[in-house]
């Protein structure tokens, strides 16, 4: 088979069994979709395209930072299914639009080859229910898991080698291509991944790499970038004279 990824009733992507072996509990860090909206004359609103996390909240370390549990989410969601489609309606009284997700994998009767394409389509639909103009932007974030070998004590993925992210574009689709390097192509988790869209190039902004800092710097940088204007800067640039805090040092000195 081609493995599978599960879509939870909150709108969350979970159970990533795509590494040529069972992985019922596999989680993909920093992998989610977000929406930004701004009504004429109003304040910008941003949400992760999931409903709020559910209890019990009983893990000894709480949520790991790669789960971005502190980012704002929708009040509730409703899932309905009609094979091969899954539909999720997101609900929040503060949101001036109706938002839903239609997700499916290729299913073509009498065509086993194309029905087995290892990919999924996620179509987010937004309807303006007001009389005002509303600007909308949707962003997707997905971790490069090529070479996945398990998790460390803090739920971060371990990899067989290095990873590379590259923006690619052609006449049909454009997006981020995920590959690996410096390990054997015979490794059980060797391969590639992609996060792509059919949107026109002129409407796309991208951030192929997250900011490499300490603790939650990468997630905070992404969210501040996106929630400000609904667009992504290609790179994060910070001027920190006399300080290595945003690098990989454990201490900062002035």
Question: Which residue ranges define each predicted feature?
Answer:
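Beta-strand-rich N-terminal accessory domains
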Residues: 1-55
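Short Pro-Gly-centered flexible turn/kink motifs
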Residues: 2, 134-136, 254
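Short linear motifs in intrinsically disordered
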Residues: 23-26, 74-81, 164-168
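A generic structural signal for short, non-catalytic loop/turn and secondary-structure boundary residues
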Residues: 28, 81-83, 92-94, 169-171, ...
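Short polybasic amphipathic segments
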Residues: 30-39, 53-63, 86-88, 174-176
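Short, mixed charged/polar active-site loops
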Residues: 43-44, 96-98, 133
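Extended, loop-rich substrate-binding clefts of extracytoplasmic carbohydrate-active enzymes
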Residues: 55-119, 214-253
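Polysaccharide-binding surfaces and accessory modules of carbohydrate-active proteins
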Residues: 101, 106-231
């Amino acid at each position: 088979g081609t493995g599978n990824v599960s879509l939870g009733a909150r709108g969350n992507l979970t159970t990533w069994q795509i590494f040529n072996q069972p992985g019922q509990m596999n989680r993909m860090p920093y992998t989610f979709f977000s929406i930004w909206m701004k009504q004429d004359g109003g304040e910008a609103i941003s949400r992760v395209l999931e409903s709020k996390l559910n209890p019990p909240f009983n893990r000894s370390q709480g949520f790991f930072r790669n789960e971005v549990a502190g980012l704002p989410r929708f009040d509730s969601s409703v899932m309905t299914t009609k094979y091969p489609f899954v539909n999720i309606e997101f609900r929040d009284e503060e949101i001036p639009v109706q938002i839903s997700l239609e997700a499916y994998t290729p299913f073509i009767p009498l065509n086993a080859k194309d029905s087995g394409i290892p990919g999924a389509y996620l179509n987010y639909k937004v309807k303006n229910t007001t009389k005002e103009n509303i600007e909308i932007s949707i962003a997707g974030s997905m971790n490069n898991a090529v070479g996945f070998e398990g998790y460390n004590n803090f739920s971060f993925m371990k990899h067989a080698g290095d990873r590379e992210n590259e923006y690619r574009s052609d006449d049909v689709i454009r997006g981020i291509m995920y590959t690996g390097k410096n390990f054997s192509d015979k490794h059980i988790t060797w391969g590639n991944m992609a996060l792509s869209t059919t949107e026109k190039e002129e409407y796309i902004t991208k951030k192929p790499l997250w900011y490499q800092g300490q603790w939650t710097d990468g997630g905070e940088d992404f969210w501040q970038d996106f929630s400000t204007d609904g667009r992504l800067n290609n790179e994060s640039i910070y001027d920190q004279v006399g300080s290595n805090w945003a690098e990989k040092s454990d201490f900062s000195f002035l």
